[in-house]
């Protein structure tokens, strides 16, 4: 059995199939050039335009859940390059997402920009922050809700990894979809500037 290819990230399942299907070199290039452990300036600009976020969470037994959040552009805010936050509005009282995050903080966020045909993945560890505490830490943010009513609480996420979701399979009304292409431009290139961002997984020295 192949040994893990340190120091790159990747789950055991990812590594198993990369070895099985012969994509290890391609995967390592992606990890090295497109995956970073922070938000790049272009990612921060991208988040400021987004009105929808998909959030995946998991309960302590491993059962997954996927939900969605909406708001005015920029409702998900980058507090710094390692941290983002979003408001939690009044819902149905079930607290599936927050319940999972309270017990298993790991979360995976996905943002899809259909206008620019590009996506962003952000993984990290989430913390539920009550409104009073958020107001004390970030008064300019908590005092200016971007929805129609004040949030009941906030979620703050410490970023572990972030990376592009390329545009090659995004639907487009005015042309063909580039199914399966390896063309760099068709996939969106280095849209988020990750290639020139210091990465703990880039061992090339450049």
Predicted regions: what is each one?
Residues 1-206:
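Binding-site signature for planar aromatic cofactors or substrates
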